[in-house]
Amino acid sequence: MEKLINNDIWIDYAHTPDALSNALDTIKSHCPKSKLRVIFGCGGDRDKDKRAKMGKIASELADSIILTNDNPRSESPESITDDILNGINSEIDIQIIHDRGVAIKTAVTTLREDECLLIAGKGHETTQTIGNKILTFNDKKAALNALI
């Protein structure tokens, strides 16, 4: 897990239910008086069973969620998002922004003083697979660019 800007923005590779739960719990312990916002998605053409579980965990441990693309590969981003939504408590604030760069920029530029942000799922990765294209993408660079 990597921390940017004091304790406000965190980046982690968490891409399984247990890892997402652990990352959210860790950040909550570092930001006990803050609300917690999380950005995440799930990989396409991979374990579909974990999607609703990750949605449930996020809705139980975070105060708001932005769902976005991870590596959708050949799968429809909307289909992946629908699977995640099946586990989410409808009472929580949810945004769906499939473009990961836009999702990160939106979250970073609208982050309030009383919030912490977890950008989960890609961590150290430097590419994103969409369809048959492998694009250059890095969560940390996207977050830092949003701060400029």
Model-inferred region functions:
Residues E2-I148:
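ATP-dependent carboxylate-amine ligase
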